[in-house]
Amino acid sequence: MGVELKFSDAQQKQENQIKAIRSLIAQKVDVIGVAPIVETGWVAVFQEAKDAGIPIIVVDRRAAVPPDFYVTLMGSDFVEEGRNAARIMAKWTDGRASIVELQGTNGSAPANDRYLGFREILKDSPGMKVIASEDGELTVAKGKEVMARFLKTHGKNITALYAHNDDMALGAIRAIEEYGLK
């Protein structure tokens, strides 16, 4: 069959992703798959791939480009994920919570959409308030760092945590344990 997979680790930087896509275009690959770090800033490089006749498959995260610039998007409904998180939290807290939020990468489709979905449900839950929200960079280390800061500022007033992914949640749990809470 002769399939060769080429991979580039962009280190969570859009400029590195754009360089990698341009390199793949120059190599005349058959198809490009990309999980955009952020939603915006993709039109030029996607146009370059389109002009070269190389289809792009967008994975996990949307890119703010015309729909004919890529062949498909394989991903989740992040707005619904945010809604579901808020519904579950409302159930477990009887609709009363002082929430801290660890968001995903600023400007990314998952972070933007989970934020919107979560807050959509909170509008109908007056006893649930987000008291602090910050980018946790989707990592254990940053999740722990931000949660430690939340705890220093808000302490035991925090009654719930909404983390946009499991790595940040794991970091937050470590910070919570070090703070002496369970």
Show where each model-derived region lies:
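A residue-level marker of the well-folded mature domains of exported/periplasmic proteins
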Residues: 1-182
